[in-house]
Amino acid sequence: MATRAPLAPPPNETEASVSRITREGKKLTYKLNVMQQPERARACGAGAKSSADRRPVDPPPVVELRVYESDPNDDLNKTDITFAYNANFFLYATLETARPMAQGRFAPNPTCPVLTGVPVAGVAYLDRPSQAGYFIFPDLSVRHEGVYRLNFHLYEETKESKDANENAPIQSMSNPMPSKPMAPKSFLEFRLEVVSVPFTVFSAKKFPGLATSTSLSRVIAEQGCRVRIRRDVRMRRRGEKRTDDYDYDEERVYRSSDRISTPDTHGYAGTPVERPRSTSTSTVDPSFPYGVDAQRRSSGATEYGFQGAQPYQRPLPPAPGPAPAAVSTPAPPAPPAPPSHNPGYQSHLSFGSTQTQYPAPQLPPTPQTASTLAAPYSPHPSYSHARNPSTSAEYETPGYSYPPSRMSTERSSYPKNGLPPLRLEPPKPLNMPSGEPRSSDPNAYHSVAQSAAPRSQTPSSSLVPSLPPLKALSGDYPNNLSQSSSSTSQSPSHDLGAGKKFFWDTGASLSKRSYEDSFGHDDRPLYNGMRPDTESYPRRLSDASRNFYNETRDEMAYKRANGRMATKISPALQ
């Protein structure tokens, strides 16, 4: 079967010319040349946003116009009068398919125009690339994909009567100098038509991209015409990887990587990447328990307004294997020493790990020793709290991640006389009343600590089921534990004056305190116009608060509006 021969190009493709005789008997020749052919375009669609989303034909079509004058009997001697010819020229562009389609039997449905944009261009007289008139179409878009041609129709508006057609009536010419403004009576004459070569309109998925602007577009843009100039290649590379010589800024990649990387401040090879703190202590990495900011964190005493000593830290030997969770005890105030972190120390609770923060007033914190791990709540916020449940035992035996015999031997090597005496308060037994004042004598505290240490060796196995067997503990463990507990306190020394007590009741209790015991009535919200001194407002204080007011603040003094001073008993004690 014979294949169909390709369609022959039209005779007016790319170039076309036409001649006419003027009223004065001169011959004018019009010549159109499509200097820049359209090559590709992306379909802009027919949706609601197609008019705003322009996809111009690339490169923009450029048509050159030249006008020649000659004698009707001598076509060889022509004179270029493009710049001297006094007339207005317009070029109108239309779109047609490259392969004509047969008409169907039924009438086609009415469709919107396929060509959008600005299809009309006026002549621009430019000196480069040569002296001629140019028509530029920088804003032509096609709605649907396919293969098309552009038809350019030239229209002329003559301004002088001598340039009219030979058979044109005289009255049809307009007066060049009207006496008063009036509607124009001039009209346009169609001169000739030229078509472009076929070009392809791609869909958005298949569009290869825009190429660099041509030299002709640059020359035209330099002379003041509106042409979009692209100095970089925007062609898609399908199936190829990006190379270093194609739009790749190596320095920009380095800058972005430096901006998101976290430097290793300690130089550990096995240091994990630091992550945000969480409120759970079970997710702390045992190989790096202290964190990066442990050496910069101040003690709880510094948070309350007075300076605390630097915690003493020393490198510990690596653990032989996994062991139950250990409870960290505060370090004693000692001369500043360079902090060192040991990645081999196995612990789930430490100073650098997460800490439970409780709102509390600025009051002196109470120390917490190793023998009172289940002591009642203290407003000091910088202690690590154990997660092991405790029902009613006041003293618990802490678990360690290495054999206690080695720990007792190492702790016995601490200097015993290098630390200043501390005025600490001994823990209260369960049968001691909560309102009894604390003793500030360090000798009494030392004796109580010596007597309380043996109790920690014999707790009930039902209360602490997760502790290691007690038979592994050495005989000198209680003495060393009491000695180390007194030397591992983090709170600074705080001396209470005679006759003064803590405002908050820090005695032992087996249940949580109520809201009224923890906070005064000044902290309660006021509703429905309630005032602190009204009868409908609760004024109940804790026992410790009442004792404090009875001893130091039985009467309150205030100034009246008339300037007179008045005193009365505090309403909280009535």
Curated annotation (Swiss-Prot):
Keywords: Cytoplasm, Nucleus, Sporulation, Transcription, Transcription regulation
InterPro entries: Velvet, Velvet_dom, Velvet_dom_sf
Inducing or repressing factors: Expression is positively regulated by laeA.
Coiled-coil zones: none
GO biological process, one term: sporulation resulting in formation of a cellular spore
Domain of life: Eukaryota
Biased composition (Pro residues): 314-323, 330-341
Disulfide cross-links: none
Localization terms from the record: Nucleus; Cytoplasm
Chief localisation class: nucleus
Disruption-associated phenotype: Impairs expression of aflR and sclerotia production. Prevents metabolization of host cell lipid reserves and is inhibited by oleic acid in growth assays. Blocks the production of aflatrem and aflatoxin; and strongly decreases cyclopiazonic acid production. Down-regulates transcription of ps27, a polyketide synthase gene belonging to the asparasone A gene cluster. Down-regulates five genes found within the aflavarin cluster. Results in a reduction in transcription levels of oxidative stress response genes after exposure to hydrogen peroxide. Alters the starch-degradation profile.
Region called PEST, residue ranges: 457-498
Function: Component of the velvet transcription factor complex that controls sexual/asexual developmental ratio in response to light, promoting sexual development in the darkness while stimulating asexual sporulation under illumination. The velvet complex hat acts as a global regulator for secondary metabolite gene expression. Controls the expression of the cyclopiazonic acid, aflatrem, and aflatoxin gene clusters. Controls the expression of the sclerotium-specific pigment asparasone A gene cluster. Controls the expression of the aflavarin gene cluster.
The record's note on its domains: The C-terminal PEST domain is a region rich in proline, glutamic acid, serine and threonine residues that is required for the light-dependent regulation of development and secondary metabolism.
Family: Belongs to the velvet family. VeA subfamily.
Name recorded for this polypeptide: Developmental and secondary metabolism regulator veA
Lineage of producing organism: Eukaryota, Fungi, Dikarya, Ascomycota, Pezizomycotina
Gene name in the database record: veA
